């Protein structure tokens, strides 16, 4: 819908005195429904301030996402024919409910047994990705990275060059080879090993030089892309980007960060050393319906980002500018990235709603554990507080 004179305006560069605002969304397959629930609430609060046309892309300098979070990022920032976001935040949850069962079709009968799943995993990825690829291309069309309505950061990993490839709005200005179609970027960052096939595509730079990408899920290097986003902004400050000229490279008190996880099964403690000591290669790759090695790498990288940012913001006494929303109490099928039954998807929706009511948690730097704050403020209240911060919204 076209914007009217009373509708909100895209946030001004931080040189106008505003905070550098970052929204970051973890990877996690179908568990992307959890952050989808959180951001729907966040956008509704912004709409209470600035009207129903308000969208998250109008308020954040950077929106970043890995894997399923990368898909959400594209949906929030890709322009429609009126140059407004293709999706509102509240439309993402129904999108997941409709399409996840087709992206991750569940086998029944003999085909759904553990043995059958194991045999299939030996012959290739668990899912062929055809429905996902077609869906993403249909929704995003030929929209390219430089066209997003705010800056985006989406990590992937190139298995040919063996290094991360970060598709960033900031980097595309100097490296046009990264100006790929959003559909190609989303398919790449979602290509989780063992679940979906690796993805290959080529792109031309402004001089006509062709570059080939051989990409898999960004979760193998940055399942929590918050720090990648902050690094991108910091590089712009060092390069004296005029949007950031009044901000010093280490002035992290000027950052406002909302980082949303997709849930973990930490509290379930489903693995232990006695169990893993008996594992061979196969067990490390797939064990009792899980993928231990992949889960460990993605979770450890996400937690290290949270630990680093918690330590940094607490040292600078700006911890109230960093909100990490995560649920470590998932169990059973709720912690799966691909069990896309109606029952499980509905449960994940409820987990997201419940997470809003849970107290804000922060890393205890003494023991590394995430602990609820003593003041009892909920994630819902914390989001409301951030929305009402004076520099967070601008109105025409």
What role is predicted for each listed range?
Residues 2-396:
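Conserved catalytic cores and adjacent C-terminal regulatory segments
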């Amino acid at each position: 819908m076209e914007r009217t004179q009373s509708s909100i305006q895209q946030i001004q560069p931080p040189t106008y005195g505003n905070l550098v605002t970052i929204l970051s969304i973890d990877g996690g397959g179908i568990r992307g429904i959890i952050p989808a629930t959180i951001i729907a609430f966040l956008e509704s609060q912004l709409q209470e301030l600035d009207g129903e046309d308000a969208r998250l892309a109008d308020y954040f300098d950077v929106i970043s996402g890995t894997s399923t979070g990368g898909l959400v990022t594209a949906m929030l920032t890709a322009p429609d024919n009126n140059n407004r976001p293709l999706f509102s935040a509240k439309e993402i949850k129904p999108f997941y409910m409709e399409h996840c069962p087709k992206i991750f079709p569940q086998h029944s009968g003999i085909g759904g047994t553990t043995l059958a799943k194991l045999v299939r995993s030996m012959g290739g990825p668990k899912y062929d990705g055809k429905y996902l690829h077609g869906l993403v291309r249909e929704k995003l069309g030929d929209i390219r990275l430089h066209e997003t309505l705010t800056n985006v950061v989406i990590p992937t990993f190139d298995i040919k060059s063996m290094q991360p490839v970060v598709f960033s709005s900031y980097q595309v200005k100097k490296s046009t080879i990264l100006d790929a179609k959003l559909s190609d970027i989303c398919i790449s960052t979602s290509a989780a090993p063992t679940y979906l096939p690796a993805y290959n595509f080529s792109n031309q730079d402004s001089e006509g030089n062709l570059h080939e990408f051989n990409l898999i899920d960004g979760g193998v290097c940055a399942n929590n892309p918050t720090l990648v986003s902050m690094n991108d902004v910091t590089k712009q400050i060092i390069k004296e980007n005029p949007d950031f000229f009044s901000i010093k490279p280490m002035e992290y008190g000027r950052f406002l960060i909302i980082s949303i996880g997709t849930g973990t099964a930490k509290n379930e403690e489903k693995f232990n050393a006695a169990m893993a000591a008996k594992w061979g290669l196969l067990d490390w790759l797939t064990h009792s319906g899980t993928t231990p090695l992949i889960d460990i790498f993605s979770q450890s990288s996400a937690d290290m980002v949270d630990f680093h940012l918690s330590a940094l913001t607490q040292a600078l006494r700006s911890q109230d500018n960093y909100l990490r929303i995560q649920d470590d109490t998932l169990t059973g099928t709720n912690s799966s990235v691909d069990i896309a039954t109606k029952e499980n998807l509905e449960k994940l929706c409820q987990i997201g709603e419940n997470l809003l009511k849970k107290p804000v948690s922060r890393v205890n730097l003494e023991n590394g554990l995430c602990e609820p704050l003593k003041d009892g403020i909920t994630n819902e209240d914390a989001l409301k507080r951030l929305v009402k911060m004076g520099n967070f919204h601008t109105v025409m």
